[in-house]
């Protein structure tokens, strides 16, 4: 392993001069700095993270705060995490993943040390108890999600309210008059999780505008729950012809359940979803869907954080517009 003394010997300077070139703590001549940088490149030297943090008061580490609470769909969370880690490496930063439900205490524990330079916070609630602390920290943060009162924070997310509306509007254009939303697990709504609540708001408002009969059904993600919710929907809304699904693991089991109950997709029932594009496109019946742009959201969250670390102004709110892709799961409603 290359040491700082090897770099110093190669550049013809003292180890302390190499340290000053890395940290900028003391001025050195441009010619000396270039010799040191050339030696670092030639030898492939990488400063020890702890030493670099002590020298520069920076750790080059970002915290990704994503509590793995009940009802969270872990594969989607991991898509966000991979995007954050990959983008952070482009900026020579590593990522510390915090998954425990520790609330303010966990955030404060990390923020009060030199472990991380900045934070990305996920699984945002409408009335998120972490907001006062995030506003008071001397370290920058970005939230992937929008609380009810986002003033003074930097937030980015898919426009989930419009996403819910877009799905309903698509069904309405196809002539469907009775629609239902099969949503996230009940505990997600009990917590007031922002993205799930906004889908409900958009779905309900769009249905009301179009004069559609509508209902909302939170549902567990276990495959066995699909049959129960399908039976309940058909019992409570026998004229149902359009369904919006915001529960990725339930998509295929739900289509299977409807077909077992005698409804063909899309001949008898049109289904749309808000989910990752590869999920929608890869099912037995490809699903008309609004894509969940987890890779773009993770990438742009890191980019916002890097700009904040550099002292550059960033917008407080960034909402990505939803994009609906029509596939084989929706069709015009057959005339009664």
Where are the predicted features?
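N-terminal helix-turn-helix DNA-binding module of bacterial transcription factors
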Residues: 1-60, 334-336
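Amphipathic helical "hinge" segments at domain boundaries
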Residues: 30, 38, 45-108, 118, ...
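Short acidic active-site motifs
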Residues: 50, 105-108, 129-130, 225-229
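Bacterial carbohydrate/catabolite-sensing allosteric modules
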Residues: 86-90, 136-143, 147-336
């Amino acid at each position: 392993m290359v040491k700082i003394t090897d770099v110093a010997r190669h550049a013809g300077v003292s180890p302390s001069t190499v340290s000053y070139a890395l940290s900028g703590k003391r001025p050195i001549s441009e010619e000396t700095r270039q010799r040191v940088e050339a030696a670092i490149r030639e030898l492939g030297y990488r400063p020890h993270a702890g030493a670099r943090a002590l020298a520069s008061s920076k750790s080059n580490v970002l915290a990704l705060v994503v509590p793995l609470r009940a009802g969270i769909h872990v594969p989607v969370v991991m898509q966000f995490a991979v995007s954050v880690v990959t983008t952070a490496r482009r900026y020579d930063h590593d990522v510390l993943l915090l998954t425990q439900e520790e609330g303010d205490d966990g955030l404060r524990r990390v923020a009060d040390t030199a472990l991380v330079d900045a934070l990305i916070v996920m699984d945002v609630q409408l009335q998120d108890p972490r907001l006062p602390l995030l506003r008071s920290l001397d370290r920058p943060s970005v939230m992937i999600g929008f609380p009810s009162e986002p003033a003074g924070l930097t937030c980015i997310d898919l426009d989930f309210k419009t996403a819910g509306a877009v799905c309903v509007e698509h069904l309405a254009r196809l002539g469907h008059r009775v629609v239902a939303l099969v949503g996230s697990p009940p505990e997600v709504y009990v917590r007031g999780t922002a993205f799930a609540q906004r889908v409900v708001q958009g779905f309900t408002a769009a249905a009301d505008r179009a004069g559609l009969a509508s209902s909302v059904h939170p549902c567990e993600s276990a495959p066995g729950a699909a049959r129960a919710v399908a039976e309940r929907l058909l019992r409570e809304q026998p004229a149902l012809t359009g369904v919006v699904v915001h529960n990725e693991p339930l998509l295929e089991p739900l289509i299977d359940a409807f077909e077992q109950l005698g409804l063909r997709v899309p001949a008898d029932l049109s289904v749309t979803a808000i989910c990752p594009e590869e999920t929608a496109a890869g099912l037995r019946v490809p699903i008309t869907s609004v894509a969940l742009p987890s890779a773009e959201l993770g990438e742009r969250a890191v980019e916002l954080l890097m700009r904040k670390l550099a002292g550059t102004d960033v917008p407080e709110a960034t909402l990505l517009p939803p994009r609906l892709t029509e596939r084989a799961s929706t069709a015009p409603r057959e005339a009664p």
